[in-house]
UniProtKB/Swiss-Prot annotation:
One Gene Ontology biological process: response to hydroperoxide
Protein name: UPF0246 protein NGK_0633
Family statement: Belongs to the UPF0246 family.
Cystine bridges: none
InterPro entries xrefs: YaaA (IPR005583)
Organism: Neisseria gonorrhoeae (strain NCCP11945)
Domain of life assignment: Bacteria
Entry GO terms, CC: cytosol
Amino acid sequence: MFFVLSPAKNLNEKDPCPVSEFTQPDLLAESEILMRQLRELAPQQIAELMHVSDKIALLNAERNAAWHTPFTPENAKQAVFMFNGDVYEGMDANTLNTNQIQYLQNHVRLLSGLYGLMRPLDLMQPYRLEMGTAFANLRGKNLYEFWGDIITNLLNDTLAQAGSNTLVNLASQEYFKSVNTKKLRARLITPIFKDEKNGKYKIISFYAKRARGLMVRYAAEHNITDPEMLKNFNYEGYAFNDAASNESEWVFMRSEQIK
């Protein structure tokens, strides 16, 4: 069983990584192709392409200029400790033990606009390139056309090498669109997290993102290899709802918190 997650825009570049183990991204040669094109963009072009402020555009122009291989622990950081958004706050990898971190490495993959597909302990240098960005490139008009079936093929190889036949999709729609589900050789399960608000259950983005990270943490802390055991996920008040679920979409609900 493998999980796939989206990356995060917010990055933690400063805090030291709590583990020394690292791996290299499998698709770094593809990343270098993209980065060569990204480096050609002036800050103003980055601002327009990515719909960001001038300050963020300048930061990322500087990141692009500084980006270089080979990656080492001195100039890069393990991805699961670099990403710093809601999903990763829910996972809170910094407080997992060595065996649990190894579980992440063995069972979790991170989608990325620049790096394609990463292991949690793959080294990465800071960047900003969301998968949905309309970044025209040598292979097409956007990143979905750039990556084509490359990410799907690597996922299939990863699943086959591990003898696994289940992929748990905890990524956003924007990122999971980079996976060709018609060619994916695995059973696909998509957990959906709903919170009660004013008597109705709905997906609330912030809570849903955090819950995705919490589910990965739950799996790591319980060393889960059987997908059915994920139905016992109960962190922060969530519970599996069988009636609202089907074979491929598993719904977890949480009652409104009384403050």
